[in-house]
């Protein structure tokens, strides 16, 4: 079971990724991410558990509404455009004990 702070951090990271997916340029991303961070900082010192639960629910609703249908995947990341394009050979595809060339030179 996740603690409250872990849940909020995961929701925040997911929201930031959704904002990144919809942002046309980096300046727009920074502006929207700053607004999100300011809204989270505004509720940071809240002590009423019902208000906290409502804020978390609003963040969950934000994430479900703004989830991008085609999210950005880094090219070197899993399922990116360069993922496993030039993979290394299998560990013992070449016999390590027989490393001499055909004509006898190393």
Curated annotation (Swiss-Prot):
<comment type="similarity">
    <text>Belongs to the complex I LYR family.</text>
</comment>
<keyword id="KW-0999">Mitochondrion inner membrane</keyword>
<keyword id="KW-0813">Transport</keyword>
<dbReference type="GO" id="GO:0005743">
    <property type="term" value="C:mitochondrial inner membrane"/>
</dbReference>
<dbReference type="GO" id="GO:0045271">
    <property type="term" value="C:respiratory chain complex I"/>
</dbReference>
<keyword id="KW-0472">Membrane</keyword>
<comment type="function">
    <text>Accessory subunit of the mitochondrial membrane respiratory chain NADH dehydrogenase (Complex I), that is believed to be not involved in catalysis. Complex I functions in the transfer of electrons from NADH to the respiratory chain. The immediate electron acceptor for the enzyme is believed to be ubiquinone.</text>
</comment>
<keyword id="KW-0496">Mitochondrion</keyword>
<keyword id="KW-0249">Electron transport</keyword>
<keyword id="KW-0679">Respiratory chain</keyword>
<dbReference type="GO" id="GO:0006120">
    <property type="term" value="P:mitochondrial electron transport, NADH to ubiquinone"/>
</dbReference>
<dbReference type="InterPro" id="IPR033034">
    <property type="entry name" value="NDUFB9"/>
</dbReference>
<protein>
    <recommendedName>
        <fullName>NADH dehydrogenase [ubiquinone] 1 beta subcomplex subunit 9</fullName>
    </recommendedName>
</protein>
<comment type="subunit">
    <text>Complex I is composed of about 45 different subunits.</text>
</comment>
